[in-house]
Amino acid sequence: MAIEGVLNEGFVTTTADKLINWTRTGSLWPMTFGLACCAVEMMHAGASRYDLDRFGVVFRPSPRQSDVMIVAGTLCNKMAPALRKVYDQMAEPRWVISMGSCANGGGYYHYSYSVVRGCDRIVPVDVYVPGCPPTAEALIYGIIQLQAKIRRTNTIARKG
């Protein structure tokens, strides 16, 4: 039976990659790693006005239950090992959103002796959300960009 015949019969055809990535994008569970004022905007995005639940985003308190980490705020040298430890406790696949100028590159405190100049020096970052602090809309846009990135990835390894 040709593909046209399958579609006429009411069947939907897809690849396993697209199906798995579709389910992953519809249920992103971020673990909040709020370090400074950007965390207030992150909480604002989760409240009723913006309602991240409509994107399938449900904040989780444990790294073992989450697949996205949102680093929001200034990362200090003393907090960097804790960030890496929490990241290592997350199950694969896992993604990181760096939220705000301080998390992206040190921000206002860039030249301070105690500030890590970007959380990408500690964990790999998938999406950067700029701003000081970024608005809730900017965080939502970053989550949408992460969903688009997940849809483009190959989930099942192909042997070539």
UniProtKB/Swiss-Prot annotation:
<keyword id="KW-0411">Iron-sulfur</keyword>
<dbReference type="GO" id="GO:0050136">
    <property type="term" value="F:NADH:ubiquinone reductase (non-electrogenic) activity"/>
</dbReference>
<dbReference type="GO" id="GO:0015990">
    <property type="term" value="P:electron transport coupled proton transport"/>
</dbReference>
<dbReference type="GO" id="GO:0045271">
    <property type="term" value="C:respiratory chain complex I"/>
</dbReference>
<dbReference type="GO" id="GO:0005506">
    <property type="term" value="F:iron ion binding"/>
</dbReference>
<feature type="binding site">
    <location>
        <position position="132"/>
    </location>
    <ligand>
        <name>[4Fe-4S] cluster</name>
    </ligand>
</feature>
<dbReference type="InterPro" id="IPR006137">
    <property type="entry name" value="NADH_UbQ_OxRdtase-like_20kDa"/>
</dbReference>
<keyword id="KW-0004">4Fe-4S</keyword>
<feature type="binding site">
    <location>
        <position position="37"/>
    </location>
    <ligand>
        <name>[4Fe-4S] cluster</name>
    </ligand>
</feature>
<comment type="subunit">
    <text>NDH-1 is composed of 14 different subunits. Subunits NuoB, C, D, E, F, and G constitute the peripheral sector of the complex.</text>
</comment>
<keyword id="KW-0997">Cell inner membrane</keyword>
<keyword id="KW-1003">Cell membrane</keyword>
<dbReference type="GO" id="GO:0005886">
    <property type="term" value="C:plasma membrane"/>
</dbReference>
<dbReference type="Pfam" id="PF01058">
    <property type="entry name" value="Oxidored_q6"/>
</dbReference>
<keyword id="KW-0472">Membrane</keyword>
<keyword id="KW-0479">Metal-binding</keyword>
<feature type="binding site">
    <location>
        <position position="102"/>
    </location>
    <ligand>
        <name>[4Fe-4S] cluster</name>
    </ligand>
</feature>
<feature type="binding site">
    <location>
        <position position="38"/>
    </location>
    <ligand>
        <name>[4Fe-4S] cluster</name>
    </ligand>
</feature>
<dbReference type="GO" id="GO:0048038">
    <property type="term" value="F:quinone binding"/>
</dbReference>
<dbReference type="GO" id="GO:0008137">
    <property type="term" value="F:NADH dehydrogenase (ubiquinone) activity"/>
</dbReference>
<protein>
    <recommendedName>
        <fullName>NADH-quinone oxidoreductase subunit B</fullName>
        <ecNumber>7.1.1.-</ecNumber>
    </recommendedName>
</protein>
<dbReference type="GO" id="GO:0009060">
    <property type="term" value="P:aerobic respiration"/>
</dbReference>
<keyword id="KW-0520">NAD</keyword>
<keyword id="KW-0830">Ubiquinone</keyword>
<dbReference type="GO" id="GO:0051539">
    <property type="term" value="F:4 iron, 4 sulfur cluster binding"/>
</dbReference>
<keyword id="KW-0874">Quinone</keyword>
<comment type="similarity">
    <text>Belongs to the complex I 20 kDa subunit family.</text>
</comment>
<dbReference type="InterPro" id="IPR006138">
    <property type="entry name" value="NADH_UQ_OxRdtase_20Kd_su"/>
</dbReference>
<comment type="function">
    <text>NDH-1 shuttles electrons from NADH, via FMN and iron-sulfur (Fe-S) centers, to quinones in the respiratory chain. Couples the redox reaction to proton translocation (for every two electrons transferred, four hydrogen ions are translocated across the cytoplasmic membrane), and thus conserves the redox energy in a proton gradient.</text>
</comment>
<keyword id="KW-1278">Translocase</keyword>
<keyword id="KW-0408">Iron</keyword>
<keyword id="KW-0813">Transport</keyword>
